[in-house]
Amino acid sequence: MNKKFEKLGFYPADILLPKDQDMRKWAVVACDQFTSEPEYWQAVEQTVGDAPSTLRLILPEANLKAPNVDEYIADINASMDKYLADGVFQVLPESLVYIERQQSDGRIRHGLIGMVDLDAYDFTPGSGALIRATEGTVLDRIPPRARVRRNAPIELPHVMLLIDDPEKTVIEPLTAVSYTHLTLP
């Protein structure tokens, strides 16, 4: 890991981006969304069809208690291996990626994609760890998540970190620079 970032617990990483994919089928919401609406995920399945998609790389929490959850997990790991072997990804080595997301109200959220040092993370309420949870952690969701990661050749985190930056020295300077970007339809 890059020593310059040690005190942050947040580092540049080898970031995988899909290349030559239909982004309407590739991108899906975080796995912890629509947990009580399996019909939402069935509709996503219909939309994606056989196309490469992050749907094949995540375990929607709506399926955590499915009787065939172990089969889902094996399929996720197989999809990861296949996508890597088939060259589905473009690799951005040792990178941070600046992102902008437009919310439904029109506001733009700005952020960085990178790697979090999980040794610096603690989800215990009241923790003083460098990186800590801002909302409650549902403990019974951890074991299936750990099973997905056990044999996973890639990581697909879905967390958003909030930073304590009252001087606005991290994200705000990036918003002033012009970038080439991909706009999703």
Question: In which residue ranges do the predicted regions lie?
Answer:
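N-terminal extension/subdomain marker
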Residues: 1-177
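Conserved small/polar residues in nucleotide/adenosyl-binding loops
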Residues: 180-184
